[in-house]
Amino acid sequence: KYLDLLAAGKASAATAMVDPGVNNDQRTFLTDDVMASATSLLVVEDVVADKNDDSDTRTVTATMQVNGERFTHAFRVTADDATMGVLDNWKIRDSLAVPVTVDGDGIGQFSVGETKASIDKASFYVEGRSFLFYPGAYNFTPVAPNEYVDTTPVSVSVLDDVRTRNNDGKSDVTFKATYNDKLEAAALEAAQTLVESCGTYPGNQGDDCSSLIRGDSVTAISIKEKPTSLDSYSFDPTSFSGSVTYTVTTGEGALFPGTRDVGLTVKVDARFDDDGVLKVTADGKPDFRVSFAF
């Protein structure tokens, strides 16, 4: 009866019959709606009890399939109070709800079907968060935190353990944010804003401007060349840099008075929150740290 309920996608009835024995925050996906979203559910092939007819504890072995993958599971059942003292009753002691550990790099939420959950961690040292699922093949979809992140669903087969295509040896499912061209375009806009702000007098006296283009001896400044594109640096897809050239005129008090070109590198680095998710400003733009380097 229990396996037939799972094969029919009746998660609520199966949970009522056999308690998974975990807190409610781990039962988020033990619902009929989530099982209805599965691309494959449990197929029961065979159910056989052991030969210990006189024992109050028995083992029932079930042979099943999910998405064409066969597996067996041994259930422990114990004798319960008989109905009206005549009909035998048995209680299943272990649920077929399987823990799936989900972690995210730059991803804070995921969904299965229409149900969402946060991948919040108990501490920095904990890998991911565990949720229970009944057997089936599901699409785990990372929720993009903003328009600068692209997401790709992960196909997960839950048998009596977890089968995924991207197992990293730590979590069953690990999402990694993929940053799209919109982030680079926003970084370029942020870089040009600082370049232009520092390319006028007295704008070049701002604290964010390079010491090479500010100071009491600078009497005039203009932009000779500003970046029209940026490159990633340090193998980090969220850190960018580009070249800028200013024409700077210095007067009395300068070591070498006159007009000269000053070449600088403008660097743009995205900021992240404590969970590693890209931060955005109140107007929805990435929160960048923009600075100059030699």
Question: Residue locations for each model-derived region?
Answer:
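Detector for Asparagine
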Residues: 23-24, 52, 67, 89, ...
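Structured interaction patches on ligand/partner-binding surfaces of diverse proteins
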Residues: 145-178
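Cystatin/cathelin-like cysteine-protease inhibitor module
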Residues: 173-178, 184-294
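Short solvent-exposed beta->alpha transition segments
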Residues: 11-69, 205-234
